[in-house]
Amino acid sequence: MASELAMNNSDLPTSPLAMEYVNDFDLMKFEVKKEPVETDRIISQCGRLIAGGSLSSTPMSTPCSSVPPSPSFSAPSPGSGSEQKAHLEDYYWMTGYPQQLNPEALGFSPEDAVEALISNSHQLQGGFDGYARGAQQLAAAAGAGAGASLGGSGEEMGPAAAVVSAVIAAAAAQSGAAPHYHHHHHHAAGHHHHPTAGAPGAAGGASASASGAGGAGGGGPASAGGGGGGGGGGGTAGAGGALHPHHAAGGLHFDDRFSDEQLVTMSVRELNRQLRGVSKEEVIRLKQKRRTLKNRGYAQSCRFKRVQQRHVLESEKNQLLQQVDHLKQEISRLVRERDAYKEKYEKLVSNGFRENGSSSDNPSSPEFFM
C-alpha cells in the first residue's frame, strides 16, 4: 500500500487507489463541508504529513499545496487499508478551494469524471499563478519544513488541484453557462485572487483568465473545451457584474429624466410610451410621484380659486356697501326736500285763508280747488 501511495503523477490514471477513490466519490451528491479552517491547524497537519514521509508524492499528500484537509484527516499507518479508505472518504479537500465550486454544476456521470481525470493526468504548469502564489505564502507561513512538502517549486500545482480542475472543466463543459454558478464563481474568484479590486468587471476578467489558463494547460480535448467554457462564463459574469451598476445608475438617472412639470402635463399614453423597457418598480414609483404631484397641484389650484373668489366677493361687498351708503344719502336728501315742500305748502295755505276771508265762491281760493 505504501508503494502504491508513493507513485508518481504519471501513474495517477492507472492507480487502483485513485480509481477506487473516484468510484467511491458520488458526484451526484456532492457536498462541501462548511468548517472554518485555521492556519495553525493546517501547519500542524502539514508538519505531521512531512514527518510521516510516505505521503510526500501522492495525490492525497498535498493539502498545503492544494487545499487544506478535513480536521479528521491524519497520516495513515502502513498496513491498514480500511482506515486509509475511511480517511480518503472523509477527506474534504474542496473546502478551501479558491474558486468555491458550486455543487449544482456537477450534473455529470462518474464515467465523464473518469474521462476528465484521464485526460488531465499530466501536471498543469503555470495555469494557476494566483493559486501558486497563495501556496507559496502558506508555505512561507508554515516554515522551511512545510516548504519542503511543496516539492521545492511554488509554481508546480499539486495532483489534487489537477483533479479539481478536471472536475470543474467537465462540469463547465456539460452544464453550460449557468448564470447563478458563474456569478457565484465570479465573486469567489474576485475575493480570493483580487481582494483589493473594486470593479466587478476586473474580478470577472481575472476569473475568466484563470479558467481559460487551466483549460489550455491540460492539453486534452475535454480539458480545453471545459476551460474555454469556464473562461467564457467568467467573462459573462464579469460583464453582468459591470452591468448591474449601469442599470442602477440608469435608474437613478431615470428619476431626473422627467421634471415635475413634465410628469404633470404629460398624458398617460405618452408616459407609458416613454416608460417602455423600464422595471415595474420604477414605473409604479414614477406613476405614484405623478399622482402625488397632480393631487398637490389640484389642492393648490383649489386653494388659489378659493382665495381668488374670496377677493372677488369682498370687492363686490364693498361696492354694495358703497351703493347702500349712496342710497341712504339720496333718501335723506329726498326726505329733506319733502319736508321743505310740505312746510312751504302749509305756509301758502295759511296765507290764502287770511287774504280771502270767508268768501267760499272765489275760484282763486284754495278751498275752491280742493
Curated annotation (Swiss-Prot):
It comes from Mus musculus (Mouse). CDD domains: bZIP_Maf_large (cd14718). Homodimer or heterodimer with other bHLH-Zip transcription factors. Binds DNA as a homodimer or as a heterodimer. Heterotetramer of two MAF and two USF2. Interacts with PAX6; the interaction is direct. Interacts with MYB; interaction takes place weakly in normal T-cells and increases in T-cells following stimulation through the TCR engagement. Interacts with MYB; the ternary complex formed with MYB and the CD13 promoter is regulated in response to differentiating signals. Interacts with USF2; the interaction inhibits its DNA-binding activity on the L7 promoter. Residues 180-195 have a biased composition (Basic residues). This is Transcription factor Maf. Changing L334P: Abolishes interaction with USF2. Residues 57-84, 175-244 are annotated as: Disordered. The gene is Maf. The keyword Acyltransferase does not apply.
